[in-house]
Amino acid sequence: MPRTQRNDNFIDKTFTVMADIILKILPANQKAKEAFVYYRDGMSAQADGEYAEALDNYYEALKLEEDPNDRSYILYNIGIIHASNGDQEKALEYYNQSVDLNPRMPSALNNIAVIYHYQGEKAREEGREEEAEALYDKAAEYWKQAIRLAPNNYIEAQNWLKVTGRSEMDVFF
């Protein structure tokens, strides 16, 4: 039974009914509709913390989805799961694939920056100052891109950029 048929709460059931109606009237081919069902089930599993099930659904969606923008969101969600599981390198791989398909995705750019910043912190703790600075610079570049796309978001990143002297702008928003 598909995950979306197992939802217990009213909001999930309502969303599922609405999504099913939209799928029926959406002028999309069958393959795209199937991809959406897998994506929707992946999001539901991910929200429930069922990461293995979510990944299975996302991988199936990737096999079917052809639209680059839609693929970027699938890849982004796969990246989130890998980051949640502590696999930063794999998360970076998927976030970068997502940005390659959709360079206007500030959340993916932010997540890439967060990982580089974290890696910079670890390098600094281990006394690898040059490596830390290089990682911080990478984080700064990704945060600047994210902030340009969503100037009212990422306030902590904006402050960090200012405090560390990595900001060329006085005000982002």
UniProtKB/Swiss-Prot annotation:
Keywords: Membrane, Photosynthesis, Repeat, Thylakoid, TPR repeat
Gene Ontology CC annotations of this record: plasma membrane-derived thylakoid membrane
Listed SUPFAM superfamilies: TPR-like (SSF48452)
Residues in TPR repeats: 35-68, 72-105, 120-153
Membrane topology per record: Peripheral membrane protein
Keyword DNA-binding in annotation: no
GO biological process: photosynthesis
A Pfam family recorded for this sequence: TPR_12
Keyword Repeat attributed: yes
Subcellular location: Cellular thylakoid membrane
SMART domains in the record: TPR
Function per UniProt: Essential for the assembly of the photosystem I (PSI) complex. May act as a chaperone-like factor to guide the assembly of the PSI subunits.
NCBIfam families found in the cross-reference section: PRK02603.1
Family per similarity comment: Belongs to the Ycf3 family.
Protein name: Photosystem I assembly protein Ycf3
